[in-house]
């Protein structure tokens, strides 16, 4: 993952309260997301998961959408986006998302009991978003075949004590305003 690794090493760091936050095209849409970086990420995801056993890809809005769309296009697996807007459609399930810097209500539609899903997201940091998504999918009765976050920010997160294993492409930590690569192969 040379391009992903290099782009993370070059990522600017900002502070949101006590939280050191790296600004990256995968997680923030800035700086510009180069097609070769997106292609590298998508190929790595497809190699890391068993897409043959997946009925739908599920991703939370907003920054997982571009990655999940590209994976959907390459695999012909339909995509479900978990949104921050409620529509009140039949079967809509609400979930509360809490991250290191925000709290939101989100909504999922079009996932049914027994469907096999691949959950994709951009970053696993506190685990708040992923935990809420996985809990909602459990509530629906979906079978989570695999869960992937492109980047994992090393440290404790809400999924450490859960039954869900999250595969990642690269693991980093932010130390003194700099991104440090902890594991260039990620988890799983």
From Swiss-Prot:
<dbReference type="InterPro" id="IPR000836">
    <property type="entry name" value="PRibTrfase_dom"/>
</dbReference>
<dbReference type="Pfam" id="PF00156">
    <property type="entry name" value="Pribosyltran"/>
</dbReference>
<comment type="similarity">
    <text>Belongs to the purine/pyrimidine phosphoribosyltransferase family. Archaeal HPRT subfamily.</text>
</comment>
<dbReference type="InterPro" id="IPR029057">
    <property type="entry name" value="PRTase-like"/>
</dbReference>
<dbReference type="InterPro" id="IPR050118">
    <property type="entry name" value="Pur/Pyrimidine_PRTase"/>
</dbReference>
<protein>
    <recommendedName>
        <fullName>HGPRTase-like protein 1</fullName>
        <ecNumber>2.4.2.-</ecNumber>
    </recommendedName>
</protein>
<dbReference type="InterPro" id="IPR026597">
    <property type="entry name" value="HGPRTase-like"/>
</dbReference>
<dbReference type="GO" id="GO:0016740">
    <property type="term" value="F:transferase activity"/>
</dbReference>
<keyword id="KW-0808">Transferase</keyword>
<dbReference type="GO" id="GO:0006166">
    <property type="term" value="P:purine ribonucleoside salvage"/>
</dbReference>
<comment type="function">
    <text>May catalyze a purine salvage reaction, the substrate is unknown.</text>
</comment>
<keyword id="KW-0660">Purine salvage</keyword>
